[in-house]
Every structure is written in C-alpha cells, then in structure tokens.
A protein has these predicted regions:
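N-terminal Rossmann NAD(P)H-binding glycine-rich loop of SDR-like oxidoreductase domains
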Residues: 2-23
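Structural signature of the Rossmann-like NAD(P)-dependent dehydrogenase/reductase core
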Residues: 5, 68, 100-103, 140-146, ...
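A generic structural motif
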Residues: 21-27, 137
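N-terminal Rossmann-fold cofactor-binding loop
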Residues: 29-33
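NAD(P)H-binding glycine-rich loop region in Rossmannoid oxidoreductase-like domains
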Residues: 47-88, 111-112
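Active-site segment of SDR-like NAD(P)-dependent oxidoreductases
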Residues: 73, 106-111, 145-148
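Conserved Rossmann-fold NAD(P)-dependent oxidoreductase catalytic core, especially the SDR/UDP-sugar
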Residues: 84-120, 140
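NAD(P)-dependent short-chain dehydrogenase/reductase
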Residues: 118, 122, 126-179
C-alpha cells in the first residue's frame, strides 16, 4: 500500500513508520529529521511549495491512504497555514485513486467553550467532513492528546527546555486577569 504522511509530521520518526506501516511504501512530507531509506520504501521530502508540485506527487504515487497530522497536535502550535494545506491535500485526494483519509488532530474539537482555537479546529474537521460528503472520500477524524517531543523544534516543551538551557530561567506568562 502507498501511504502519504503530511501536515505536522515533525513528530513522525522512522521507528513510528516501521511500526505503523510495515510493508507499505511511505512518503513523509515536511519532516527534515527523517531521511529517505529506499530499502524500507520510506521517502522523505519537503512539503511542496506549489500546487503543481503537490499534484505531481499525487499523480506519480497514487496513494491509497493519506494521514494528515494537524498543527493542533502541538500545544501552542503554529496555526497559520493549516486550513490551506489541509484543503490542498484534500483536493488531490478527491482527484486521485486515494481511498482513505485520516485527519489526526488535537483535543480542541470536542470542547464546548468557543475560543478562536476551538473554532478553527472545528472548522478544519468540518472541511474534512464536507469533502467526504461532497466527493465520497473515506474520511476519519481522530482526536488525540497533544503530542510532545524533546527533539522536534516546533514543540512547546522543546522550546521551553531550550530557553531554560540557554538562559537558565523559565518564564511562564500569565493572563493579565488571572489573580495570584
């Protein structure tokens, strides 16, 4: 089976790929820490800069499954670009032979308190559902706890530990209305 891993792939390791996708041809987009290993059928490359490049990848590999790791898996992660990248991947999934799409996201989608972040997460999940309804994609949404890593540079705790290591001080900002 040909599998594409895209989105917030900084948490994906070679060991994870071997365990989760044995005997599959796997392409990981956007993770600089994973190296291509042809004998294991693992291909790693940067996320395409243009839609034409992304289209070429989908036409060349004809993925049977796509796993999209949301930026919302990272505590206090980067939110910009999530909807656009998700839309691009879904567009090519609907055009190709792809049969399964798994959207792995953080826990915010189940919260009832409307905040900017919960609204964005719920909208991303709705986009997945709409593509499933409109184009017959087989979409699953998996909500998981936040992911943490001591090596992924965009990770919340990695940044805290690096700051601590460099300045020997930790600073946690509180909301102004919070009382001591």
């Amino acid at each position: 089976m040909k599998v594409l891993l895209a989105g917030n792939t900084g948490y994906v390791t070679e060991e994870f790929v071997e365990e989760a996708f044995p005997e599959c041809q796997v392409m990981v987009l956007g993770n600089k820490m994973i190296k291509t290993v042809r004998r294991r059928e693992l291909i790693s490359r940067p996320f395409p800069r243009t839609e034409l490049e992304l289209g070429d990848i989908f036409r060349t590999y004809e993925f049977e499954a796509v796993v999209y790791f949301s930026n919302y898996l990272t505590l206090h992660g980067e939110l910009e670009g999530e909807a656009e990248n998700l839309r691009k991947i879904l567009q090519y999934c609907r055009k190709g032979v792809q049969s399964h799409f798994l959207y792995v996201t953080g826990p915010e989608g189940m919260y009832d308190v409307p905040t900017g972040k919960t609204l964005l997460v719920q909208n991303a999940e709705d986009v997945c559902r709409r593509y499933a309804g409109l184009y017959g994609l087989k979409v699953k949404i998996l909500r998981v706890p936040y992911l943490y890593s001591g090596t992924y540079k965009k990770d919340f705790f990695y940044r805290i530990f690096q700051a601590s290591k460099e300045s020997q001080k930790l600073f946690f900002q509180e909301a102004p209305e919070q009382k001591a």
